[in-house]
């Protein structure tokens, strides 16, 4: 499958993925992002090659699946899994559990957590992707899907979702105080860390997703159906861009052609500690 992206954006090779995670990926920054929750009780996941079709041959049978990492001793352990799989994407589970070991012992599929006594809530998030908006050149999401270009986008579409993200942020901050914006590699995520958002019921989330559907969000993220979200500071291997938290002041001028570019596209990566980033 061929994708259409803005200039300079392309799938990363296996060697480039390995280079990024060995020398540039910052465990310190990930730990800070997840600092509000118990990392030991957090599940992670990798998608090996679902969209890029670039993967280690031994993982062909699972290249399209989300491989859940729920038995780990911390972020260094998670990084070992990442280096094993060299995935196109890395994610974390927004669900908050009292004891994730109980989920593992019971063989939970994580799809029916809402009524479980071990489930404490879910981090609220909004996922605004450029393919969700209509484009005078490339059509609607339905048109793109028919052509097999569901994840493709142009700068016109990107600028539309950038504007929508700003508008959605402005509307959300009237209700919530702890908001963070993240460039996902293609579009944007808005994370809500207010406790009242964490405790929202599934029914409340469904209504909320419907209320904000005009912002080109993926409703299944906001309504709680999809619990995984891309891990900040990881590599979006489909477009070779770093998933990057942004201040709201940075958002209006953010351009994926010039920002969040990994070192392997700029120059030879500089060797650094596994727990430190070589980027400033």
Curated annotation (Swiss-Prot):
Q: Which Pfam families match?
A: DNA_primase_S (PF01896)
**PANTHER family given in the database record:** DNA PRIMASE SMALL SUBUNIT (PTHR10536)
Protein name from the UniProt record? Uncharacterized DNA primase small subunit-like protein AF_2298
The Gene Ontology biological process terms listed for this entry are:
DNA replication, synthesis of primer
Family per record: Belongs to the eukaryotic-type primase small subunit family.
According to the lineage, what is the superkingdom?
A: Archaea
Which InterPro entries does the protein's record reference?
DNA_primase_S (IPR002755)
GO MF terms here are: DNA-directed RNA polymerase activity
């Amino acid at each position: 499958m061929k994708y259409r992206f803005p200039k300079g954006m392309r799938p990363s090779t296996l060697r480039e993925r390995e280079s990024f995670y060995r020398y540039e990926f910052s465990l310190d920054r990930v730990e800070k992002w997840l600092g509000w929750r118990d990392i030991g009780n957090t599940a992670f996941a990798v998608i090996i090659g679902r969209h890029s079709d670039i993967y280690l041959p031994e993982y062909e049978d699972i290249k399209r699946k989300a491989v859940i990492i729920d038995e780990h001793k911390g972020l260094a352990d998670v990084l070992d899994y990442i280096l094993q799989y060299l995935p196109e994407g890395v994610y974390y589970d927004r669900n908050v559990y009292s004891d994730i070991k109980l989920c593992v012992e019971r063989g939970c599929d994580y799809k029916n957590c809402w009524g479980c006594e071990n489930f404490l809530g879910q981090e609220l998030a909004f996922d605004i992707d450029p393919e969700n908006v209509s484009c005078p050149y490339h059509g609607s999401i339905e048109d793109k899907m028919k052509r097999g270009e569901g994840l493709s986008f142009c700068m016109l579409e990107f600028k539309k979702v950038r504007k929508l993200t700003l508008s959605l942020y402005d509307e959300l901050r009237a209700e919530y105080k702890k908001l963070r914006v993240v460039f996902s590699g293609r579009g944007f995520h808005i994370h809500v860390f207010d406790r009242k958002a964490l405790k929202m019921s599934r029914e409340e989330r469904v209504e909320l997703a419907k209320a904000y559907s005009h912002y080109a969000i993926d409703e299944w993220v906001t309504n709680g159906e999809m619990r995984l979200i891309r891990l900040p500071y990881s590599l979006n291997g489909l477009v070779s861009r770093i998933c990057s938290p942004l201040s709201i002041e940075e958002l209006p001028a953010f351009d994926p052609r010039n920002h969040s570019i990994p070192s392997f596209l700029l120059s030879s990566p500089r060797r650094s500690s596994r727990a430190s980033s070589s980027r400033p």
